[in-house]
Amino acid sequence: AGALVAWQKRCGRHGLPWMVADAYRRWVSEIMLQQTQVAVVKDYFARFMAAFPTVQILAAADDEAVMKLWAGLGYYSRARNLLACARVVVRDFGGVFPKDVETLATLPGIGKSTASAVASFSYGTVAPVVDGNVKRVLTRLFTVTSPVGTVACDQFLWEAAEKLVSKTHPGVFNQAMMDIGATVCTRTKPACMICPLSAWCLAFHEGSQESFPVRKPKKERPVKDAVFTVYLSDGRVWLTEQNEKGVWRGLWTLPAASEAGEDIGCFTHDFSHYRLNARVELVLHKPSTENARGFTRKDAEEGALPAPVKKFLLASEVLAGRF
């Protein structure tokens, strides 16, 4: 643990905007960094903090304002849970995030690893982080043959991490493990010769680094076909708010086709569990539904739209100059 703490101070990542002992900023960053790279998160984080600098301000925000700033990051349930969690923290904890991992992990959208990150970075709580990067480091360090995501693998990794975590500098230790996974012990071509763990790494000594972590066999991703309608009228594209349960809930999107229109193109988008193949048709009138709103081009650029829908509308040659 001591070697890793020293390595992080000397070689680890520093200066990221959320690297402060502030539970709110740490929590927002940890949620954003789930399934999303640091380079992408930086700009979103800056805009989010400018709009919602405290958990109290976030808790008081309306859903659409939050979804608008989140649009493009994907995995939109994260944004919905972020808002729900902020409201619980303000209502039940006086706007102060709990210090213990167990209580943090009961909050909406916070799992064990995120809870450990918030607690260790903000309060110095002795708790290990086991995110995707750390899992890769540990599976190579101990040549874990159980596939990641299985009960056996997860149990081993958590037990190992709990034994390894520094009792005096848990936050720095966790940052070191995350930094090693992100910058040294990478998925392909790991830089083992500069890794502070190479002396103890079983995979390095076997020359089997890229065999770990062991993955579950990939399931073929199902394909879903859909037809959407662009309602164009009064120099606006008319969108509907997705209120039903689904990945785009809370966003403004193209309504599902309910009448024939002119075929103006298609787009595909990969979700975590399926691929969407969408065909888009144009109709030159307003929709009959009551929850429709007209969007100018500027509205579409700035609004809470799913990234693939926004990209299609703004790139369409058929729609250029018409809204």
Label each region the model flagged.
Residues 1-14, 19, 182-323:
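Intrinsically disordered, low-complexity, charged terminal extensions of DNA damage-control enzymes
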Residues 2-193, 197-206, 210, 223:
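Catalytic cores of DNA base-excision repair glycosylases
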